[in-house]
A protein has these predicted regions:
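N-terminal segments that mediate ammonia production and transfer
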Residues: 1-176, 185-186, 194-195, 199-203, ...
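Structural motif
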Residues: 11-13, 20-21, 29-30, 38-40, ...
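Short acidic (Asp/Glu) and glycine-rich catalytic loops that position anionic groups and cofactors
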Residues: 108-110, 117-120, 277-284, 306, ...
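Glycine-rich phosphate-binding loops that contact phosphosugars or nucleotide phosphates
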Residues: 173-328, 362
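A general structural motif
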Residues: 212-213, 336-342, 384-392
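Acidic catalytic cores of enzymes that act on phosphate-bearing nucleotides/polynucleotides
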Residues: 350-392
Length: 392
């Protein structure tokens, strides 16, 4: 067990005396990097890029034998030290013992580098990421706001986000439910995205809601989800609960669009379409997610407008007003950050003197209240309530 104080993430690896050379993963992704005369095994590409940009992603979900989907799901990889760093040094089998030879075209080249996780001059990642929030928001909007024939703003997403199949289903009315899922902060952003989607769809016969990923997979799955579009939100793209839910809904016919911050992540491989926050490499290292949350909300609003356009919603003036306000958010965020000394003084004055805290809000502000509760709980280790104003 090891902990990096700058990152504040915890890593666990089970080791037995009899098999001290073995590493077992379940749910979380596992990557094998090919270096010069060495293999590197990590749960994310960020653990590899200092040494190599080539890696093999293990696939624990796809059965190797369709006639035995349960027994053949999962992979075992043996790495030969004498052939380290080569394809010949990798032996891959499924859980039922079937050989799965590795070919060169299965290797992925990383789109990220160590520059993407540089802390710069900041004392810790949290301050760096809070300060970068307006820039991340701008990057998320960049290239995704266009105009219609009347000069009014509209969302622009390509086929990499909404593939032709999903566009056709939306236009034909084959999709009548949109589920926005995530865990933790991503679930908070999902509430905002679902509310924006419902508002943009108006009186169309399409529902939009935001259950946590675990609630959907544990209690709300139906056998046939071919009428459902799932929007999965994850900063890292490796959130186990979210990714497992994506596997389950796809197996039942649902389409999946991911809002994700990390290129080459597990969720990117699983989704039908991807909308990257910022430029897909605006890495967030602090456990207390900040800039990713804002970017996820921005991406959720962009996707909501794009979906509304595909189903034929035509309210150009209202759409323009919403997107114009969205484009002004980075400047408002910068103005707020400029008041850091005043905010610090308020924190010093009120926080230590109050033992019990509660955060309240209404409507869209309730989303912010719930997210702020998560942030304060993570950073201050306090149990804090978040409610609608009337309930307090």
């Amino acid at each position: 067990m090891a902990q990096n104080p700058d990152v504040a993430n915890l890593g666990l690896a089970p080791v037995t005396v009899r098999h001290d050379h073995a590493l077992r993963g379940s749910g979380q992704a596992l990557y094998v990097g090919l270096c010069d005369d060495a293999f590197v095994v990590a749960s994310e590409p960020y653990g590899l890029v200092e040494l190599t940009d080539r890696y093999l992603r293990m696939d624990g979900e796809t059965p190797s034998n369709p006639d035995d989907p349960t027994g053949s799901r999962g992979q075992i990889i043996e790495l030969e030290a004498a052939l380290a760093g080569t394809l010949e040094g990798i032996r891959r089998r499924s859980y039922d013992g079937s050989e799965l030879p590795v070919t060169g075209d299965e290797l992925t080249h990383a789109e990220i580098t160590t520059r993407d996780i540089d802390r710069g001059h900041y004392p810790h990642f949290l301050l760096k990421e809070i300060t970068e929030s307006p820039v991340s928001f701008r990057k998320t909007l960049r290239g995704r706001l266009g105009t219609d024939g009347n000069g009014r703003l509209r969302a622009v997403v390509g086929d990499e986000t909404l593939p032709p199949r999903l566009r056709s289903q939306l236009a034909a009315g084959a999709i009548d439910e949109i589920l926005v899922i995530g865990q933790g902060t991503a679930a908070s952003a999902g509430r905002a995205a679902a509310a924006a989607t419902a508002e943009r769809l108006g009186d169309r016969d399409i529902s939009a809601r935001s259950p946590p990923a675990t609630e959907l997979s544990g209690f709300q799955l139906e056998n046939d989800l071919s009428n459902v579009l799932v929007v999965a939100i994850s900063q890292s793209g490796t959130t186990t609960d979210t990714n497992r839910t994506v596997d389950l809904v796809r197996a039942r016919g649902a389409g999946v669009v991911a809002i994700v911050n990390r290129r080459g992540s597990d969720l990117v491989d699983k989704a039908d379409g991807v909308l990257y926050t910022a430029d897909g490499r605006d890495v967030e290292m602090s456990v207390a997610s900040t800039k990713a949350f804002y970017s996820q909300v921005a991406a959720g609003f962009i996707l909501a407008d794009a979906i509304a356009g595909e189903v034929g919603v035509d309210d150009g003036d209202r759409r323009h007003s919403l997107l114009a306000a969205l484009s002004q958010m980075p400047a408002a965020m910068e103005a707020t950050l400029a008041r850091r000394p005043e905010i610090a003084e308020a924190a010093r004055q009120f926080a230590p003197a109050r033992r019990y805290w509660a955060i309240v809000g209404n409507g869209p502000n309730l989303v912010a209240a719930r997210e702020l509760r998560i942030k304060l709980s993570e950073l201050c280790y306090k149990s804090i309530a978040a409610d609608s104003t009337e309930d307090k």
